[in-house]
Amino acid sequence: MAGHSQFANIKHRKGAQDAKRAQKFTKLIREIIVATKQGLPDPEFNSRLRSAIITAKKENLPKDRIDAAIKTASGNNQHDNFEEVVYEGYGPGNIALIIQTLTNNRNRTAAELRHALSKYNGKLGESGSVSFLFNHVGLIAYKASSINSFDTLFNTAIELQALDVEENDYDEEKMYYVTCNIQDFGNVRDQLFKKFSDAEFSRLFWKPINITTIDDEELQKRILNLMDVLENNDDVQHVDSNFIFNTKI
């Protein structure tokens, strides 16, 4: 299906993060803390918190740690004052990268990202240096096996003013990706949750307008190594990009 490669890297990177349990939990807890601080501590009245809790449960974060993170968010510990900062840059092969972080120290995070990108022949750019290559959208992802009818999902999503519903057969497990405008994200996500149950994951996503195909295997390896370094950084929540590999390595 046209456009499916725009989502090709999401599943791989999500799986790569799963390999490190403690680090994965750290990222989940940060998202819960930030979501709680931005609204009420009750997920029924805070859609971002609800989504964070759903994701945390799917990743087997213990309930007591979820509850503790929500409680922590109501405190005044300056070390838990995370802010959302988006960094833009280029990686090897001139691929475009948008790095979404939750950090309590902008200077530290920027320095670490700059070092990582430089090591792999990339560079950290200014705000706006690569974001024009992407559309910023809401993303709700379902396993195809959890949806009885693609047509029903498609029609429901479009009625909710979603932009598109796309099938991704790039991964071994087929996925359906619903995209919507940022301002509609909370409503589209919540209404889909009610009708089709909770999604596999949902988040704000930088969707590439065009895809750069990487053919060279050595370049592919350098890109994967950079992605590992970026996503092993505790401050990094997501890395969105505009590349796809011609062959899997």
Swiss-Prot record:
Example GO biological process: regulation of DNA-templated transcription
Region (Disordered): 1-21
Sequence similarity: Belongs to the TACO1 family.
Keywords carried by this UniProt record: Cytoplasm, DNA-binding, Transcription, Transcription regulation
GO molecular function: DNA binding
Subcellular location: Cytoplasm
NCBIfam families, A to Z: PRK00110.1, PRK12378.1, YebC/PmpR family DNA-binding transcriptional regulator
Organism this protein belongs to: Ehrlichia ruminantium (strain Gardel)
Gene Ontology cellular-component annotations: cytoplasm
Domain of life: Bacteria
Short name of any one Pfam family annotated for the protein: TACO1_YebC_N
Protein name in the entry: Probable transcriptional regulatory protein ERGA_CDS_03720
